[in-house]
Structures are given as C-alpha cells and as structure tokens.
Amino acid sequence: MNVAILLAAGKGERMSENVPKQFLEIEGRMLFEYPLSTFLKSEAIDGVVIVTRREWFEVVEKRVFHEKVLGIVEGGDTRSQSVRSALEFLEKFSPSYVLVHDSARPFLRKKHVSEVLRRARETGAATLALKNSDALVRVENDRIEYIPRKGVYRILTPQAFSYEILKEAHENGGEWADDTEPVQKLGVKIALVEGDPLCFKVTFKEDLELARIIAREWERIP
C-alpha cells in the first residue's frame, strides 16, 4: 500500500494573507486541492492522508469526497511534528511506502509521483530535486563567498520512503527542514529524481500570482 501524506498545517505567515496559503483559492480551487487531485488520479497512490490544523478540518471535509482519502489528521506546530502525526495515524494501515508532499507546491505531475515511488523501492528513499542554474553566494559579515553550483540541487517534494524507514527516522523526534535529512542520518541512500520548475513552493504574494497564471492552463499540461 502506497500512501500520500499531504502537509497542509502551515500558517503561511510570509504570505501576509488572512488565511493560510494552502487554503487560498485560485481558479475555483484551493491551493491544497491541486496536489490532492494529482494523488487521487495517480494509479501509484492507494490512499491519502491530509494533515492540517483542527480549525480547518471542516473546510477540508467539505472539499474532499473520495474513497482514497483515509483521514484528516491534526498537524503540529512544525513540519516534523505534522509528519509524525501522520505516521502515527498510518500505523493501523501498515503501508509499505509513504510519499510526503507540501500542499504549498500545487503543481505536481503524476509522472513525478510514480518515479519518486519507483526509486524509493530501489533505495528506501527518494526525493524530487532540481538542478541549480543560478549563481550561489554565501554572505557573512557583508562578505560574499561564491559557492560552486556544480552538483548543487534544490530539494523539492514529493519525497517517498519506506514507511518503516521514515518511522524510524522520526522516532527520536527532532526538527528537520525536510524528511530526507533524518533518513540520511540512518545511512539510507537518497535517490534524486529530476523535477521541473513548475513544482515551486508558493511562499510570497508574487508566487501566488504566478500560480494563478499556471492554474489557468494546468489541465492542459501533461
């Protein structure tokens, strides 16, 4: 059984909106509904768990009617806490693999879902990633240090893992920027799957405007 964990518990403070960004509506759908739709259509996904804050349960319930949705789980104050809540909920389902995705990345393709899961079956863990094409610098005390961009990737989501591996990685708690970091500390090789720029994270108002433009054509994009 392959289960997608859709993280939608963030506060979206950098967006400066009245509601969390994952619940902002673009082209008739809330942001979280775009990746959810991809998971529901994907033959590689058997079930979906949506993680959000208690006060948004009713909103999500009204928007979600599908047999693949296994449940809505209350998220924590941090990303890692939300992932652990989902893993605990999934114990009774005994999934083989779980796929973790940020709801703030609305434009998820089915082919990436399938490929990340395929690579996770080979190594135990895989993540969507994008080669960096920009110049990179580190700034410290007003000094700029250039970082070689060869071999540098941007880590995206979705990220797929053996359920048992991800559960073990989170057993001792901790706070992580994503889930590949604690998994790698177990000595598990992380497979990288080449993504594309469409899988960007909506963080600022400018990102939301770009998302509106893409959403108008999203159903036509293969």
Swiss-Prot record:
GO terms for molecular function: 2-C-methyl-D-erythritol 4-phosphate cytidylyltransferase activity. It comes from the Bacteria. Pathway: Isoprenoid biosynthesis; isopentenyl diphosphate biosynthesis via DXP pathway; isopentenyl diphosphate from 1-deoxy-D-xylulose 5-phosphate: step 2/6. It catalyses: 2-C-methyl-D-erythritol 4-phosphate + CTP + H(+) = 4-CDP-2-C-methyl-D-erythritol + diphosphate. Signal peptide: none annotated. InterPro entries: IspD, IspD/TarI, ISPD_synthase_CS, Nucleotide-diphossugar_trans. The record marks 149, 201 as: Positions MEP for the nucleophilic attack. The keyword Hydrolase does not apply. GO terms for biological process: isopentenyl diphosphate biosynthetic process, methylerythritol 4-phosphate pathway. One of its GO terms (cellular component) is cytosol. Its EC number is 2.7.7.60. Keywords: Isoprene biosynthesis, Nucleotidyltransferase, Transferase. The record marks 14, 21 as: Transition state stabilizer. Catalyzes the formation of 4-diphosphocytidyl-2-C-methyl-D-erythritol from CTP and 2-C-methyl-D-erythritol 4-phosphate (MEP). Belongs to the IspD/TarI cytidylyltransferase family. IspD subfamily. This is 2-C-methyl-D-erythritol 4-phosphate cytidylyltransferase. It comes from Thermotoga sp. (strain RQ2).
